[in-house]
């Protein structure tokens, strides 16, 4: 399962059967009763051709109803979002020519129905105590909550370590910006770290989707660790992209499609930023526009930040400018000019104190 398909599967499918949902409660009841079961979500044209027998219900879904109906041998068909029970005790006759790697009759039928219809099919094993999801050509066995929680907590610890390193790299980059010593190597290094941190965040979100109501604490820890990271990276892209009118969200989306190995090559990051001419990243100086640092000044609207960036070439030009020069920028009065001047000095002082020497 590639990362994009896996993310979509976790977001759309695993959420439906996550702990805390009515559907998962019903499935767990069937699992504990050891009756086994076959549940299909969706009754489209493809389904009509393979359903045989059973009886039509069209009643609201409830865990208790699912539990009782699973005592019968046939499959249960729900509507697409699992809020209604449409049919019960039906026999499913998918095309036998469709390949299946499963051995048990129930699981083999489930896999073929999923491949033939594209619907979500849930197979509850009678003997093995396993819940298996089939969706199109995808197969996924639901794991024990304890196992997922352990993996999620390990991922949070890993994220915490990577985020600490990233925070220090961003601080060091800020200090170098004020010293006008930034090269594209430092920019690439920060982008690589951001990519790794966002990948770990994506993994944790997949766990959260599968954990459902059991994942609240994991979600809180995740938000605490990476709440402003996307904003930080978008501003970083605006600072260092070749063209000022680049769409930073598009650059970020392209970056997240790259593998860690691809981004270890600095030239790939430079291409994402719009630089196609090869140069020595260790020596080539990079001048930030100032979006990221200016956004750290409280009560400074985005329009004012844009006006400042267009009026001055970089942060240091703003820092060196006197109050009169700042006042001349559109939308900046005397009070705001003083706010900007004091804010930049304070940020510079803090960065120099926190940098890794």
From Swiss-Prot:
Family annotation (Pfam families): DAC (PF02457), DisA-linker (PF10635)
The entry's keywords: ATP-binding, DNA damage, DNA repair, DNA-binding, Magnesium, Nucleotide-binding, Nucleotidyltransferase, Transferase
Cofactor list: Mg(2+)
Gene3D superfamilies reported for this sequence: 5' to 3' exonuclease, C-terminal subdomain, DNA integrity scanning linker region, DNA integrity scanning protein, DisA, N-terminal domain
Class of the enzyme per the UniProt entry, highest EC level: transferase
Listed InterPro entries: DisA, DisA_sf, DNA_integrity_DisA_N_sf, DNA_integrity_scan_DisA_link, DNA_integrity_scan_DisA_N, DNA_integrity_scanning_protein, RuvA_2-like
Coiled coil: none
DAC domain: residues covered: 7-145
Domain of life: Bacteria
EC number: 2.7.7.85
Any GO BP: DNA repair
Signal peptide location: none
Catalytic activity: 2 ATP = 3',3'-c-di-AMP + 2 diphosphate
Quaternary context: Homooctamer.
Function: Participates in a DNA-damage check-point that is active prior to asymmetric division when DNA is damaged. DisA forms globular foci that rapidly scan along the chromosomes during sporulation, searching for lesions. When a lesion is present, DisA pauses at the lesion site. This triggers a cellular response that culminates in a temporary block in sporulation initiation.
Family classification: Belongs to the DisA family.
UniProt name for this protein: DNA integrity scanning protein DisA
